Amino acid sequence: MVEVVFMQAKRLAVFILVLLLVQIVHAKLSDIFPTPQTLILGTESFPLESFSLMWKVDADLKDKFQFSIIESEDAVRKISVTIGETVELSHYGNEAYLIEVTDEGGRIVAISERALYYALITFKQLIKDAVELPEVTIIDAPDYQIRGVIEGFYHDPWSHAARVDMVRFLGESKMNTYVYAPKDDPYHREKWREPYPDEKLAQLKELVQAAKASYVDFVFAISPGLSIEFSSESDWQKLLAKTDAMIEIGITHFALLLDDIDPNLRSARDRAKYGNDYALAQVDLCNRYQDYLAAKIPGHRLIVVPTEYYQEGTSPYRRTYNTKLSPDIIVYSTGYGIVAQTITPKEAREIYEIWGHDIVYWDNYPVNDYNRTKLFMAPIAGRGPTLPGTLGFTFNPMNEAELSKLPLLTCADYTWNSASYVPEHSWERAVAILGGEHQDTYRRFAEHNLVFFPDGPQQEYPTLTKLAQEFLTAHKAYAEARKSSADAPIDDELKDDTLAKLKALQDEFRALEGLRGEFEEYFPLAAKEAAPYLKRLENWGKVGAYYTDTLLKILEAGPLSSSTVTPEMLSTYSTALETYLKGLALNRFDVLSSSQIGSSTVVLPILDSLGRVFASNFTAETIVASTNMPVWQNYVPANAVDSDTGTFFWSSRGQRPGDFFMVDLGSVQTLSGISLLMGNSNLDYFHKCIVEISADGTLWEAVATLEGTPDHIIQFSEPKTARYLKVTGLVEKEYWIIIRQFEPIYTEKKTAFGYDRTMVDVFNKIAVDPLFVIESEITVSLEVPVPIETAGIIQDPSLPTTWTLSYSLDGETFIEGAVLDSLVQVLPLPPDPIKAL
């Protein structure tokens, strides 16, 4: 845990200077990454140019670490640089260091060469862009001995250049381990018996040298479990030959991986020798291999991944490992589960006791090989401080090496100082490090790919979600006041607030629209890996910009109704509709139809809500559906209230008591019943639930308790009035929830602006559901003839068709009008009042 101590000021006269210094030093503290264990701040500062380093190390090492920044011969303050013991570091390991800056000079003391490398990284951070050095003492060392990555994912492995860059990055981040274990390297796994080709071997040698230069231990992992015969002398010799070849190119650390294999012994000789006990066969191989390596490399400790690497509790297999595996061997575990949601001190203690050996965690974060449509760029979370029985962590990164650096920086921070680790703070500092002067651009991309774990907390699109919610809340208040109050000042104030929040949301959508160009310019390597995600965000930005442009136009024009309509207002609404249709077309044919890169579970509901706000300005009431259940992909709540049982809402987890689905009819209506249709030829429906209605959303009346079947038509014995409908689950089941329809059965439907319910439904389908398709023809009838200035249509670009727009003045005789032959087209209509289209 970081300890910050302030020394007492020496002179009262410099009180203001002391306060200023504290602010400066706090800024410098935030630059030191990972978070140091102890930092003691003084009250003075000194000109940087007054310092120089006195190197008390070997000349070769001095040349390797030379600082040209503070090497003035005229410097009056000397900072000695040494490798050795000091009383302040006596309780720390061999990566500990001390930095002390005083009025007389100072010292940098490191326990080892690697520790000196880390000390100088910290010192560089301390003097970066500085003109003065603060009076400070830093005592620092990592919590865990092993800190790094394991390239252990499936699918496309990293390039050689990416690996070389990664080991440099690890060293600069004070991580010390790189485990080479790419599942798609055949010479590591399927062809483990065969030697590496010369070209590949040369690349490995270069990578080993790069790791050594950055004080990173290169661990070569071999994975023979798919085909090895444990009792075969030939296979044993091939394993040793492969190992010797790796030692010859400078590798001194090894791991034996027995994960993701058939646990059964395949050969008759193995079954005869080991009594069909595959744990015994594995342990025998591991112990022999450890003995061989220890003889070749004194002090070597083999790391082993057992076949049962993630299960809870013990088993005969794990008991064999516990009692018969060499105590010098380190056991790899992923924690409880292949992708562990948490690793707490209690869980770590249990895992250590299960195996009876030192544990290193193969942490499957931020790996995304199991979900290639996601980037896991959130900070590491759910790992407890200083876990018992734990030597360290190696984190399995994403296939995207450059984009992995953000979460990996937070992993470096956690493994260095776990007690002081705060995920959100660490993430912000990592963004600043990687983003530099363009960190706003980097942050905008990263925060739109914030995913912790597949079953854990999702925090994607936090800014967009916040801005959208603020606008929707403001608009709801404005719309309610507009209906119920004639107090113009209040209305104007609410309108101004709504417009301000809408403009803020529009700015964010426009920023997303331009993000790809900025990211490609500032971060070209990351942009190559992020290309499909950047395109997706650009599309979201374009759609959102269209929608917010539309809403700004109509909100500034004012509500459209039969009593307020003017030619100018109709013209504004016509332009707004055209803009909206462009966004809708992009959403339907470019965003939804594209590869499901990135998440649509957040943005689609936002766009759906914006579409409903748009629709609400054309119709007095719009049915709005909501839920407290997470949404699966684009199966949004609106699908359950679109009068189309072919579309549906779908949750993304099993049902729990208290899960609800609610419908707001927009105003109090008179109902004769409710239609609740769930499921879709499966068990995804509320297996027991209660249906309630309410006029105000506060007082609820239960109208039915349902169970056993997915479809229900609830008929009231006498008409009831309600604005809200709600169905709430009462039991816990593994099945998700599908709702195809949850709609009222009206006794009498109130209408506004001359539209009958057919028009409302058709409009809402088009506005809310981009998948609504007209098969051959559609007729829209109005309750009374009204002037219609324009009509719009969107077509699927993969199935373009020529349409004829016909109109009727009496609802019976149709007159052929314009031909619709473009993908997005808005056409004028004659000035006569129209009854049907």
Where are these regions (language model features)?
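Acidic, contiguous N-terminal accessory segments
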Residues: H26-D103, I111, D129-I138
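Disordered, acidic Ser/Thr/Pro-rich linker "stalks" and the adjacent N-terminal cap
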Residues: Y573-L581, R588-S595, S599-L671, L677-F686, ...
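Trp- and acidic/polar-enriched beta-sheet ligand-binding modules for extracellular glycan
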Residues: L683-E743, S798-L837
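Bacterial N-terminal signal peptides that target proteins for export
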Residues: V5-A13
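Catalytic-core regions of glycoside hydrolase
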Residues: S112, F153, E190, E194, ...
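Substrate-binding cleft of carbohydrate-active enzyme catalytic domains
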Residues: V149, D156-H300
